Amino acid sequence: MVTERQQDILNLIIDIFTKTHEPVGSKALQESINSSSATIRNDMAELEKQGLLEKAHTSSGRMPSVAGFQYYVKHSLDFDRLAENEVYEIVKAFDQEFFKLEDILQEAANLLTDLSGCTVVALDVEPSRQRLTAFDIVVLGQHTALAVFTLDESRTVTSQFLIPRNFLQEDLLKLKSIIQERFLGHTVLDIHYKIRTEIPQIIQRYFTTTDNVIDLFEHIFKEMFNENIVMAGKVNLLNFANLAAYQFFDQPQKVALEIREGLREDQMQNVRVADGQESCLADLAVISSKFLIPYRGVGILAIIGPVNLDYQQLINQINVVNRVLTMKLTDFYRYLSSNHYEVH
């Protein structure tokens, strides 16, 4: 059982330690804790017994343990604070013209990396929730073509493919027609089911030879299931993570899955501190936060760093970036949905 004073002591030690990275002694706490040095030392000893503090080898001071950081995140972190003094600099960073969604997400990731010194990941709306709003096939050569998908009227995905040997030019038109008639307006998840249920029967009616047609459907739609992910500050991992964690970030789709699984459907923010799960990020801290992508859904920003982070400062920063990012995205999508020649 941690008393109120002990919690204040733990919070103060974490605050000092994350700024100085030096063990904290009782004298450093006396100005802020209205108790004698002996009382503070006794409370520090009790926190150490509970595993929330640990002794430094070269000093009489104490520093937070992993369990101490976990306790702090669970009991003391304020998710609703907004660092007003940082708003101006963040707004200024977004005060430029962006030409695609990925550039806006990259700016947010770069900004958080610069502020935190950590690695940052930004995720678009979950692929399965996005809707196919336009489709076309562009013939590139005698034997190659490009499938062009537009998702949510804003994101373009392409898939290059070899035209099957048994395909005539009219077969490409049939393929395009089926996709436009059956899939437009549907979510990627719906399309996934349709390819496995409706399409096998439909191609029997449309194609004289059905060899490779289902395989072609699977191939050209495969890219739509990939996460739209941007990263920044990967090299920072070398300062606080092992080689396995660094190499893990060479697999962006696995990184996206790890980040997404760390945030429940009903959570807007979460902080994981060395949660011990079987993961390359198990010994690290992950601060993740959802942000609104107007007209489309929610994305996720995640900061990955060492356990001894200044959590309150990072929560403040990610809150500000979230709000400014949503404002920028609102403007971006309002422009996309308007008549170009009426926008000034």
Swiss-Prot record:
It comes from Streptococcus pneumoniae serotype 2 (strain D39 / NCTC 7466). InterPro entries: GAF-like_dom_sf, HrcA, HrcA_C, WH-like_DNA-bd_sf, WH_DNA-bd_sf, WHTH_HrcA_DNA-bd, WHTH_transcript_rep_HrcA_IDD. One of its GO terms (molecular function) is DNA binding. PANTHER family: HEAT-INDUCIBLE TRANSCRIPTION REPRESSOR HRCA. Pfam families: HrcA, HrcA_DNA-bdg. It comes from the Bacteria. Negative regulator of class I heat shock genes (grpE-dnaK-dnaJ and groELS operons). Prevents heat-shock induction of these operons. Keywords: Repressor, Stress response, Transcription, Transcription regulation. GO terms for biological process: negative regulation of DNA-templated transcription. This is Heat-inducible transcription repressor HrcA. Belongs to the HrcA family.
